[in-house]
């Protein structure tokens, strides 16, 4: 039976490090870590996400600022707010909650955030820094950064000699995840919907990361015995056993059967999910340390 990684536990330990680093920075240089969150419109799911991010920022000891804008906000108004926050030295991280209501275009807004304040790790500058192996000045997208914490805690810092397969090639997750694994010396294959003999490719992986959004696609016979399996999928499927019209969350991995083969596995829910918000806090305190000329904490 595989060891099941408790994402909530690992996230809590990351948050503990963030709290200590926040307090130490304030003591050493008088700098309070500042996070600004921008939300446009009244989408309930977006407001729930923003609420949890703001609460966590306060819990970490950050100065947390939330800008709630009406749905009819123009592109120019939103760009103006980002420019103001870029120029504010008390703000170290800027987060724009996506998706933005139509007709707003999120891409130019995201790219206008200063790379050193881009705590979501979505700017092309930060993507480029990751691609060139610059983890000293870049910020990494939160979900792959969180998944990588699991990998490091299982295998250590150096993945030399290990084969890693990432299923999924999205800019948000697949590409940065592959890059992080490569930077740690793994031999990396990126697989996707056009990959031939996908099961065979996966069976070669010592570290298998699934991020395609297809419920329970990865079966036991896709997995090398003793592999580490990281499941990033979040899929809602019907759960008639819970009652009519009810659903449950599953990942991209058939958890029960793969648990019999893998040595380590992440569950859904409760695996990678809790790490995303923890790494957002980690990125923010890293950005604050850099701005203050201090050595940032390691996660």
From Swiss-Prot:
State the protein's name: Bifunctional protein FolD 1
Question: What Gene Ontology molecular-function terms does this entry list?
Answer: methenyltetrahydrofolate cyclohydrolase activity; methylenetetrahydrofolate dehydrogenase (NADP+) activity
Q: What is its EC number?
A: 1.5.1.5, 3.5.4.9
A Pfam family that this protein carries is THF_DHG_CYH_C
GO CC, sorted alphabetically, is:
cytosol
Residue positions annotated to bind NADP(+) are 168-170, 193, 234
Which terms does the UniProt entry file under GO BP?
L-histidine biosynthetic process; methionine biosynthetic process; purine nucleotide biosynthetic process; tetrahydrofolate interconversion
Instruction: Read off the SUPFAM superfamilies from this record.
Output: Aminoacid dehydrogenase-like, N-terminal domain, NAD(P)-binding Rossmann-fold domains
Subunit field text: Homodimer.
Which family is this protein grouped under? Belongs to the tetrahydrofolate dehydrogenase/cyclohydrolase family.
**UniProt catalytic activity:** (6R)-5,10-methylene-5,6,7,8-tetrahydrofolate + NADP(+) = (6R)-5,10-methenyltetrahydrofolate + NADPH; (6R)-5,10-methenyltetrahydrofolate + H2O = (6R)-10-formyltetrahydrofolate + H(+)
Which of UniProt's keywords are assigned here?
Amino-acid biosynthesis, Histidine biosynthesis, Hydrolase, Methionine biosynthesis, Multifunctional enzyme, NADP, One-carbon metabolism, Oxidoreductase, Purine biosynthesis
Q: Which PANTHER family match?
A: C-1-TETRAHYDROFOLATE SYNTHASE, CYTOPLASMIC, C-1-TETRAHYDROFOLATE SYNTHASE, CYTOPLASMIC-RELATED
Q: What does this protein do?
A: Catalyzes the oxidation of 5,10-methylenetetrahydrofolate to 5,10-methenyltetrahydrofolate and then the hydrolysis of 5,10-methenyltetrahydrofolate to 10-formyltetrahydrofolate.
Q: Which gene encodes it?
A: folD1
Gene3D superfamilies associated with the record: Leucine Dehydrogenase, chain A, domain 1, NAD(P)-binding Rossmann-like Domain
- Pathway membership, UniProt: One-carbon metabolism; tetrahydrofolate interconversion
């Amino acid at each position: 039976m595989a060891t099941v990684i408790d994402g909530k536990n690992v996230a809590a330990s990351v948050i503990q490090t963030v709290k200590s680093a926040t307090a130490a920075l304030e003591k050493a240089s008088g700098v309070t870590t500042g996070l600004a969150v921008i939300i446009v419109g009244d989408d309930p799911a977006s407001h729930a996400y923003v609420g949890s991010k703001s609460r966590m920022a306060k819990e970490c000891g950050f100065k947390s600022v939330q800008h709630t804008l009406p749905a009819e906000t123009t592109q120019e108004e939103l760009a103006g707010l980002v420019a103001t926050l870029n120029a504010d030295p008390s703000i170290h991280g800027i987060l724009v909650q996506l998706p933005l209501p139509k007709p707003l275009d999120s891409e130019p807004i995201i790219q206008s955030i200063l790379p050193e304040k881009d705590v979501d790790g979505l700017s092309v500058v930060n993507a480029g820094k990751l691609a060139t192996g610059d983890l000293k000045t870049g910020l990494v997208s939160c979900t792959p950064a969180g998944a990588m914490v699991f990998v490091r805690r299982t295998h250590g810092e150096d993945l030399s000699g290990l084969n890693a397969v990432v299923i999924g090639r999205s800019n948000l997750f697949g590409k940065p995840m592959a890059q992080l694994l490569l930077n740690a010396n793994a031999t990396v294959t990126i697989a996707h919907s056009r990959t031939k003999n996908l099961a065979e490719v996966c069976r070669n992986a010592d570290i298998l990361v699934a991020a395609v959004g297809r419920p329970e696609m990865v079966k036991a016979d896709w997995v090398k015995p003793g592999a580490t399996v990281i499941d990033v999928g979040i899929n809602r499927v019907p759960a008639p056993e819970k009652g009519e019209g009810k659903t449950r969350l599953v990942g991209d991995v058939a958890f029960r059967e793969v648990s019999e083969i893998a040595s380590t596995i992440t569950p859904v829910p409760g695996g990678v999910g809790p790490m995303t918000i923890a790494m957002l806090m980690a990125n923010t305190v890293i950005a604050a340390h850099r701005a203050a000329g201090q050595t940032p904490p390691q996660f």
